[in-house]
Regions:
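Single conserved hydrophobic/aromatic residue that forms the stacking wall/gate
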Residues: 1-13
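Active-site-proximal mixed secondary-structure blocks
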Residues: 10, 14-144
């Protein structure tokens, strides 16, 4: 897994500094319901504000690392940093996934994530989008 974090932010605690110091982080997948909080946490500095409190989010103890997860997130991906690559204004963190925690209500009888029920969102080019519509199955392009 790799994530990028902007290094050149003034007057704020930079995520990249926190990740460098701790060597770990959690990727919390987010939902339509959490979209406002997701945006707020992405643009608001944590230097003088408690984003958990401001957005009524609950910190949750991770299973394998010390970094907290967000309880309201349906999927938490716990990661340990393996390498850091400086890319201009960003750092790229190459990380090992050490645990994945999923809200059991979103798993089917075989343990697969029911994506259509998760109501996950994605961010692309300044916009938030919902996910979840099944538009094909692996191999459908070559089946007759």
């Amino acid at each position: 897994l790799h994530v990028r974090s902007r290094r050149q932010r003034q007057m704020c605690i930079r995520d990249s500094d926190i990740i460098k110091d701790s060597g770990e982080f959690v990727v919390n997948l987010t939902t339509r319901k959490l979209c406002y909080a997701t945006d707020y946490c992405g643009v608001k500095s944590g230097r003088n504000t408690d984003k958990f409190a401001d957005m009524h989010l609950t910190p949750q103890q991770s299973v394998k690392i010390a970094a907290p997860a967000i309880k309201e997130s349906p999927v938490n991906i716990e990661c340990k940093v393996k390498d850091i690559i400086e890319l201009g204004s960003h750092d790229m963190f190459i990380a090992e996934v050490v645990a994945v925690n999923v809200d059991e209500k979103l798993l089917d009888s075989k343990g697969a994530l029911r994506l259509q029920d998760a109501d996950l969102i994605a961010y692309s080019h300044g916009q938030y989008y919902t996910l979840g519509d099944n538009i094909g199955k692996f191999g459908y392009s070559v089946k007759k």
